[in-house]
Amino acid sequence: MTKREKYHQLIADVREDYLHRPVAQTSGGPKLLWCEDCKQEINLWTYWQNSLDAKIMLVGQDWGCPCDEASKTTMHRIRQVNDGGIEQFFPNLSGKNVNPTDGNLKELFRVLGYDLKTKEPDLFFTNFILGYRDHGTSGGFRQQWVRDDAPYFKRLAEIIEPETIICLGKNTFEGVMFGLTGKTERVRGFNRFLDSGENRRTVSLSSGKPASVYAVAHCGTIGTMNRNRGKKAEDGSNLSSKEIAVQKQDWERIKANGIQKK
């Protein structure tokens, strides 16, 4: 099978699993469902950056609910891509109503030399959890979700064979490490972990190729607020949830390891 054939087989397998996954696994709090709008890509986020020959894989935790008000414009554009009405999907990255995560990712990837307003052949975006909440965008995260989707993430990583995997947030990093190694790694004190510079692991994919796995803070409002906790601006004031200077320093350390656009 070609790489693309393996990829589309993976999408079909994940969909089939979610459609028949016992309700008991997702009872209590938000339930995870498959999104039928994932027709061309494995994840809604993947419509943004989706090179199967990517050098860098960006991994988030989970999308949230695609049916909520905040997702309407995004879902409309993705459906246009699926129907052939437009060729490519990009989120709104300028002007009003820019999603904080998307806007901050644009700035953070600029540290590595990438422009997220274009399709970058080095990049592939996905969430680790491939299902979608039936309501809400956060809270109620369950380790069962990680155990269920870990085999699919491993298959995805082994199709793409990235050199670098950047994980947004503690749960994502722990999930990726479990998915790729089968071992559980628990991070205590996530900010200290990032500050230490020891937030990099090297794993071997089934082909024998190594991949560097980096933990970074999620760059949404809450993740940025948590990363800035206890940090001060140059004038001594507290950093707000809109300031990503600390996260830029984290990404500069990734760049210092040679991870950047060539």
Regions from the language model: what does each represent?
Residues 2-164, 170-184, 211-212, 216-231:
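A polyanion-binding, active-site-adjacent surface
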Residues 1-3, 167, 236, 262:
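Intrinsic low-complexity, intrinsically disordered segments enriched in polar/basic residues
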Residues 183-262:
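A hydrophobic alpha-helix/topogenic segment detector
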